[in-house]
Amino acid sequence: MPKLNRCAIAIFTILSAISSPTLLANINEPSGEAADIISQVADSHAIKYYNAADWQAEDNALPSLAELRDLVINQQKRVLVDFSQISDAEGQAEMQAQFRKAYGVGFANQFIVITEHKGELLFTPFDQAEEVDPQLLEAPRTARLLARSGFASPAPANSETNTLPHVAFYISVNRAISDEECTFNNSWLWKNEKGSRPFCKDANISLIYRVNLERSLQYGIVGSATPDAKIVRISLDDDSTGAGIHLNDQLGYRQFGASYTTLDAYFREWSTDAIAQDYRFVFNASNNKAQILKTFPVDNINEKFERKEVSGFELGVTGGVEVSGDGPKAKLEARASYTQSRWLTYNTQDYRIERNAKNAQAVSFTWNRQQYATAESLLNRSTDALWVNTYPVDVNRISPLSYASFVPKMDVIYKASATETGSTDFIIDSSVNIRPIYNGAYKHYYVVGAHQSYHGFEDTPRRRITKSASFTVDWDHPVFTGGRPVNLQLASFNNRCIQVDAQGRLAANTCDSQQSAQSFIYDQLGRYVSASNTKLCLDGEALDALQPCNQNLTQRWEWRKGTDELTNVYSGESLGHDKQTGELGLYASSNDAVSLRTITAYTDVFNAQESSPILGYTQGKMNQQRVGQDHRLYVRAGAAIDALGSASDLLVGGNGGSLSSVDLSGVKSITATSGDFQYGGQQLVALTFTYQDGRQQTVGSKAYVTNAHEDRFDLPAAAKITQLKIWSDDWLVKGVQFDLN
């Protein structure tokens, strides 16, 4: 199977995209190209196939994001979504739009593979079977271990989640650069005689862009207030980047000579393997709904610039329960500001960074070669006696950045109006301008003697290789309201909540905190906006179905202070429900048949979850495990922490140290010790668990570390550790993060 080009979109939805409440449906057997793809997979039992044509039926809707995450992350299944079986273009576009609405990001492709990547969803769109590697659908080893243990691993949280409602995902841009694309003439002087060769080895583009979809609410005084806008942030920062752009592991050369006798002419030539004349990255929005708000770098950067910079952006946020004592009864409004930072480490070496903003929608960053930019400048000698035969190029003048695993850093923030609707396509082009290096020796003959001079050739070919990635943002997505969804529970029933169906009709159904159909945003105007469709609102004039949102007072609601009564601003009456049927209505008072009590609580369709900071370092491979029913952490430790896991057969890390376990019940605080390890590198060397009753248990050792640093995490009251994220290599554990219920 050849190495294939693909654009993989990795979504780790910290605030989940909204989707249908229907449970995972039984989908037909695959056919056509989908069957060909699955037939190449060794274990097809790990694959869940969805024919999007079946989703056109009203009773067979898309799985919700929570259900999809459970299937892919917890059960470690591979999902293949097939749009190719929809025969008409209009129907296909409609289902692709439904997909975008359900999961927060959309693609105009025939197929989408959905897999797990670093504990999150990875979306890989493609159009033909030969564009995808069947290995992508193979179940990983961890899936077999988790299946045997019965453990699941719910979606992870992010430190931004507790403060900032947002959807975040990764775009993995992968493109192999073929030998043909990097093939040039062996000789510039004797093109037709010396043949050609690939000037690259294992060349590829492999970058991971981080994307955030979020809302900033206006907060603060005029002149320094946070923007009131919908935000799309695209970053290549220190926490993403990928493997980089690679042309060669090292630079080699070949020597060629003239095939005829020369007197006063070029007689010898060297061709050196390819380097990058420039690297270019272009960001573009497809329409004027989105405009560039901020970029980093903000200006051009000279060569030999080496510094770690922070790109910060301040947003206005609701602040959550900590700021408002009203909790889920609080209207959506900015009560705090939050600075979202990205660290960008620069070491430009031979290159100058040139920023070019063509208009409000497009900006490009070009790493343009400035130091030793010509073949002539790479020469380490100018003349020699004629009998000297030596390679005249000093390849040490070419930094590895020019050909091996170049990783750029940049940050682009787009804004849209707070009232913007519709959608925008965002396109990212990542490219490298490949050039071979040609140098020649010229024989100078002057009867009584001769010598040679060295030269570089600049009128030589360049070849730009580009990989494009795109994603579509739906401006009507509920994350752009900036609020946390809530439900409305009918208090005369033990377990009934207001639920909306696909036609907007309202009914009472069993409460489910993960259903978007039972979730609403209580907005600035006091309207209850459906999280399933942000264009529909609860209207006191028509309580059998949601109505298009407008400025009518019948759509505005207030909570009567000190009660569980939700009153309509226009009529002054309270929302009530029939105690037998759950039918909604407005009433001045309750009676034997009608209750006015309505309970509201936050729903977790946005999957907000609290986590500890990362204790230690985010080096090595990240592994995510759910804590088992015994609530224990299993450890192998000695001079440092060798391995961690939620079970003795799920340990990740090295094989050293002795095995023990830690009781995670009743933990009050966790202190991590890290620093310069006596046996090499910066390591996490010890974890100390302090319990509610004052007991302490330490795993690892502090005896073999210098320049020690301690980080302490205090667990909130009644919080339980439910999940682990562990960073490790084959020797030691590097870092750990604890997720709470």
UniProtKB/Swiss-Prot annotation:
Alphabetical keyword list: Cytolysis, Disulfide bond, Hemolysis, Host cell membrane, Host membrane, Lectin, Membrane, Secreted, Signal, Toxin, Transmembrane, Transmembrane beta strand, Virulence
Region annotation Beta-prism domain: where it falls in the sequence: 607-741
Expression induction: By hemolysin B cytoplasmic protein.
Site (Susceptible to proteolytic cleavage): 144-145, 148-149
Signal peptide region: 1-25
Domain Ricin B-type lectin residue range list: 484-575
GO BP annotations listed: cytolysis in another organism
Positions of the pro-segment in this chain: 26-157
Topological type in the membrane: Multi-pass membrane protein
Effect of residue 453 to F: In strain: N16961
Classification via InterPro entries: Hemolysin_beta-prism_lec, Hemolysin_N, Hemolysin_N_sf, Hemolysin_pre-stem_dom_sf, Jacalin-like_lectin_dom_sf, Leukocidin/Hemolysin_toxin, Leukocidin/porin_MspA_sf, Ricin_B-like_lectins
Protein's UniProt keywords contain Kinase: no
Record localization: Secreted; Host cell membrane
Highest taxon listed in the record's lineage: Bacteria
GO molecular-function term, one example from the UniProt record: toxin activity
SMART domains: RICIN
Coiled-coil region list: none
Post-translational modification: Proteolytical cleavage is required to convert the 80 kDa hemolysin precursor into the active 65 kDa hemolysin.
Function: Bacterial hemolysin that causes cytolysis by forming heptameric pores in target host membranes.
Domain commentary: May bind to glycans on target cells via the C-terminal beta-prism domain.
Assembly information from the UniProt record: Monomer. Homoheptamer. After binding to target membranes the protein assembles into a heptameric pre-pore complex. Proteolytic cleavage triggers a conformation change that is required for membrane insertion and pore formation.
Stated family: Belongs to the HlyA hemolysin family.
Name under which the protein is recorded: Hemolysin
Source organism: Vibrio cholerae serotype O1 (strain ATCC 39315 / El Tor Inaba N16961)
